[in-house]
């Protein structure tokens, strides 16, 4: 079964065809095949279904946009995303500023771009580079009371994510791009060059 992302699919059985069928959990693999096949730019807006837990930030069914572009880097993709949001917001709302949950969101301004390490330093005051090893990172997490989900196997990357969730996420009101996530956060990440 080729499904891509590290998530469990919803499974059913098609009685007339007598085969098991799966609802898709991502759009990534087929789009990447198109890029390899010679298309320079591809995207899909599609429904995604993941047979996993639910909470206020995770729904098992959602719509995503996935896009890939040859001959660019992730900064080029960041530019594309900003322009996409700016254009859609202007065309749909007639303005580049919208109100969401009582807060004005300025989509038209240049978005802040921070590495995850810089975001944690900015909002938590914690310097990732001061951690000599995983144990030092875990000790720092304990000191700041963000170690609830961590254990003795947690790496510096896990600790960075814990700080991000505890101190950074709630401060990201205006459009902001966070990049250079630690490799432990996603199975398909390519090492930063």
Task: Please describe what each predicted stretch is.
Residues 1-76, 86, 149, 176:
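Class II aminoacyl-tRNA synthetase-like tRNA-binding/catalytic domains
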Residues 44-47, 97-101, 130-135, 151-157, ...:
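Short coil/turn segments at secondary-structure boundaries
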Residues 23, 27, 77-81, 156, ...:
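Hydrophobic (often cysteine-bearing) scaffold residues that line and stabilize catalytic clefts
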Residues 187-193:
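Conserved small/polar residues in nucleotide/adenosyl-binding loops
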Residues 59, 63-64, 68, 72-96, ...:
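A conserved active-site cap/scaffold subdomain adjacent to cofactor or substrate pockets
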